[in-house]
């Protein structure tokens, strides 16, 4: 049995045992609640709502409250010097579909919902990193103080004397061309 539910203005096709990401819902982590906005129920017999199916409900459990990956928002208008750069993370709720019930029939999930607390997992990882850093520092032992040798100062090299460069004299043909150019220009 499957159902098409509506939440957050969007429609989702779900079956018992599915995990669905929907827009953020104000529900506690691990909370079990019913969604009554069922647009259609399918399976052995199909029921289409106008707009909702009466007596149909989907029981779900909140398994995760988190944010999506970072999305880059980049706007540009060419040749105008207009560039905007921003990022965005959308909050979402992950739901585990426990059961679908309609017209006295109920389709239940064989599996149990696994609730994940993202903040607790992140805190555990941070503590593990700190503990590993402290352990490495303890294994390394006390730092030894080593005196640096004084730097040797190199003597400056004496600069070479400048050599006069000889300038070639202009040939007669070059002088004629310059003169010709000057006379050809008119003011």
Swiss-Prot record:
<dbReference type="GO" id="GO:0005840">
    <property type="term" value="C:ribosome"/>
</dbReference>
<keyword id="KW-0699">rRNA-binding</keyword>
<keyword id="KW-0689">Ribosomal protein</keyword>
<dbReference type="InterPro" id="IPR028909">
    <property type="entry name" value="bL21-like"/>
</dbReference>
<comment type="similarity">
    <text>Belongs to the bacterial ribosomal protein bL21 family.</text>
</comment>
<keyword id="KW-0687">Ribonucleoprotein</keyword>
<comment type="function">
    <text>This protein binds to 23S rRNA in the presence of protein L20.</text>
</comment>
<dbReference type="GO" id="GO:0005737">
    <property type="term" value="C:cytoplasm"/>
</dbReference>
<dbReference type="InterPro" id="IPR001787">
    <property type="entry name" value="Ribosomal_bL21"/>
</dbReference>
<dbReference type="InterPro" id="IPR036164">
    <property type="entry name" value="bL21-like_sf"/>
</dbReference>
<dbReference type="GO" id="GO:0003735">
    <property type="term" value="F:structural constituent of ribosome"/>
</dbReference>
<dbReference type="GO" id="GO:1990904">
    <property type="term" value="C:ribonucleoprotein complex"/>
</dbReference>
<feature type="region of interest" description="Disordered">
    <location>
        <begin position="157"/>
        <end position="187"/>
    </location>
</feature>
<keyword id="KW-0694">RNA-binding</keyword>
<dbReference type="GO" id="GO:0006412">
    <property type="term" value="P:translation"/>
</dbReference>
<comment type="subunit">
    <text>Part of the 50S ribosomal subunit. Contacts protein L20.</text>
</comment>
<dbReference type="Pfam" id="PF00829">
    <property type="entry name" value="Ribosomal_L21p"/>
</dbReference>
<protein>
    <recommendedName>
        <fullName>Large ribosomal subunit protein bL21</fullName>
    </recommendedName>
</protein>
<dbReference type="GO" id="GO:0019843">
    <property type="term" value="F:rRNA binding"/>
</dbReference>
